[in-house]
Design a protein with these regions (language model features):
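Alpha-helical cap/lid subdomain in secreted, periplasmic
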Residues: 22-30, 38, 42-168
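A detector of helix-start/N-cap boundary segments at the beginnings of structured domains
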Residues: 4-6, 143-144
Length: 168
């Protein structure tokens, strides 16, 4: 039997500077699992080996690579469907969804991101799912390419994740 709770942060690489060891505590062992370029359907497959370890909690950050070619509603629905399936298969695993973050490589996508997050918030509220409240992340929190978080953005997001982990 594990002494520390196991927490996975599964993400699509936008949060490349978030470190699991930095989020680990005396009672929680956090590990960041990054899947560069992953789309929502890919993440479903990537999660399978992680779920076999029966984690106590998962923070899921995905959708960044879908938003360019899919509607905001489709992206939000697909994310919620993945989380709902995990809940059904692993009811004791605490789940949280990290919202899509802004990007500066294509500013037009930010309207789609805002809409997807709005829909995601509504879905989460109606289904009793946890959508993390990520504030203060703006275009100054992105690297030069405008897709991934810089150190400032990673620090802000890490703090949000740490708050979730402290309360669970």
């Amino acid at each position: 039997m594990r002494k520390k709770k196991l927490v996975f942060i599964a993400e699509d690489s936008i949060i490349q500077h978030v470190q699991g060891w930095d989020l680990s505590t005396n009672d929680k062992n956090a590990a960041v699992k990054s899947f560069s370029g992953a789309r929502i359907a890919d993440m479903e497959n990537y999660l399978k080996p992680l779920l076999r370890k029966e984690p106590d909690a998962i923070i899921l950050h995905v959708g960044t690579n879908n938003i360019r070619d899919e509607s905001p509603r489709s992206v939000a629905e697909d994310i919620v469907n993945v989380v709902t399936q995990i809940q059904q298969d692993f009811p004791s695993t605490r789940l949280a969804i990290s919202p899509l973050l802004p990007r500066s490589d294509n500013l037009e996508l930010n309207d789609k991101i805002k809409e997807a997050n709005k829909i995601l918030k509504s879905f989460c509220s109606s289904r009793g799912l946890t959508l993390l409240r990520v504030t203060n992340i703006d275009l100054t929190c992105l690297n030069r390419r405008g897709v991934h978080l810089n150190r400032k953005g990673s620090s802000l997001l890490s703090n949000c994740y740490a708050d979730f982990l402290k309360s669970n």
